[in-house]
Amino acid sequence: TNLAPDSLRAVHPLGRSPVLSTPDGAIAESGAIVEYLVRHYASESFCSPTEGEALQQYLFWLHFAEGSLMPPLVANLVLEKARQKGAKPFFIKPITNKLVDGILNAYYGPNLAQSLRYVESYLASHTWFAGDEPTGADVQMIFPLESLVASGKAKDFAAIQGYVKRVHARPAYQQALAKGGEYAYA
């Protein structure tokens, strides 16, 4: 969104967040940051799967979060902001609203709906995204899913709502909120 301060360019050339400063250099991109933290700091009870189906699911969900689930959410956020912001002559507003609706209904809405159905079907038979315990894949997936639940867009998806409640009930999640503070999901 180009809203990050210029000071981030001193940390990473893109000047965007998130970015993590490590002894080996800066790491940008959420998935890479999560994977780095898991590999370097995770305990036995919170680690990356190393083989089999759990590894396949870990890799899939780790990248699905930002590669498939976040793009329609971000596009929706940006288009809705464009609809609401800025001074528009009264006769232009219906045209911009129709344009935004057309973009959302033709592409982003159907893709988001398809992704939500897929996530819902997976969570209907799995507690976590990659194995019997939470992993970095869950760290990646929680933000878009809790954003959807908070916005009311996941009201018809009981398994997604249950998953978000499970994550929110975890002591580690509560500790993270205590350290980082509450946030509004978008």
Question: Which role fits each region the language model picked out?
Answer:
Residues 10, 169, 178-179:
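Phosphate-coordinating loops and pocket residues in cytosolic domains that bind phosphorylated ligands
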Residues 13, 42, 124, 171-172:
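Proline-centered flexible-loop/turn and helix-kink motifs
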Residues 173-186:
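Terminal-tail/helix-coil boundary detector
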